[in-house]
Amino acid sequence: SSAASDVYKRQIYEFDRIVGSSAALQRVLGIVKKVAKSNTTVMIRGETGTGKELIAGAIHHNSLRSARNFVKVNCAALQENLLESELFGHEKGAFTGADKQRIGRFEQADGGTLFLDEIGDMSPNTQAKILRVLQEHEFERLGGTRTLRVDVRLIAATNRDLPSMVQSGQFREDL
């Protein structure tokens, strides 16, 4: 049942289920517990396989948005045009093969949390569109003219060195 699934998900993301006793991990968990209670956008940086998605899930499932959707997108797994369609959705006929309207991940996460994994792989154009959603809480589906409003908390993760990417113009400083 859906209720049993929700209980299971909450149990997975309980802070005491994140295993580790190092001082560094305890510092991270202290920060994560504080961040979970806020509504702020979060950036998680760490090497591949270090549990960034687990931390993102713990933040969501211990937040005021925990009763709403936790939607995950791996930005590195999709080409730019597919990523934009995945994030923002598209209208019927927006591009070849768009035979019906599709709701994007931002709409699916409305009221909840959107987790963007490997955000450092995102193009500057898509970064600008993400920034608009963060600042204005609105966007249009691909091929659409109607502005849609959403209330989404964004948690992003990367294994990249974003400060050096900002310096080289590969990543937006304001994002």
Predicted regions and their residues:
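AAA+ ATPase active-site-proximal loops
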Residues: 9-149, 154-160, 165
